[in-house]
């Protein structure tokens, strides 16, 4: 009996996340988001990187496309190709999807504000593929929560041409901070990325872990939020252009988003 008790205790210590997922009444997993509606693309021109309202997906300064339903390369049988190009160096394309709250693509509008304020844990799980990964300045994967007048942006950036390292975003000072953790996605192969974050009971951002191709790094970074009037949970995917704005494509597949 003692051995059984110790085994149960050990399992509980090793798997706190799984335990929280199965017991939370708010637990929900959205699968294959790369196939779903609600994605909007925005051009971010250097050097200010503010949204360009006059830019067109077919323009010369910066251009972009998003093509779902790709059978090859694919993990699930239906990946989505994201492409950027143009002539203005270091310009980026941001794709955003509103999951919960304002403009929800999932029909989860939470007008009574009973869901978003109770969510504290988020997991961004995605496979990505590139045929010329070296043309990317960086790839960005973000989880965003807006509740109680506070803006929580868990930004994660894999610098590639920019230096093969993970950065995380500082909400208050609006800047990227190096983690010292290497980021070396494999070219011509599927890469599997899992990002885990949390909003603490004291309303702080907690960057928990980054796992790339089975290699997990514990971040344990805590930061303060910014302010907002929004009420929502959203996710971002972004591709950054390099010094020549060389065109390149990234395929996303099995993009799953979990919250509780």
Label for each model-derived stretch:
Residues 1-4:
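Positively charged n-region of N-terminal signal peptides that target proteins for export
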Residues 168-194:
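Short, aromatic/His-centered strand-loop micro-motif at the edge of beta-sheets
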Residues 219-253:
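Flexible glycan-contacting loops in extracellular carbohydrate-active proteins
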Residues 76-78, 82-166:
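Secretory/extracellular carbohydrate-interaction modules
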Residues 193, 250-257:
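Extracellular beta-strand elements of beta-rich domains used
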Residues 15-20:
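Sec/Tat signal peptide C-region and signal peptidase I cleavage site
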Residues 126, 189-199, 208-210:
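Short tryptophan-centered beta-strand motifs in secreted/extracellular beta-sheet-rich domains
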Residues 40-90:
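Extracellular glycan-recognition surfaces and repeat-rich motifs
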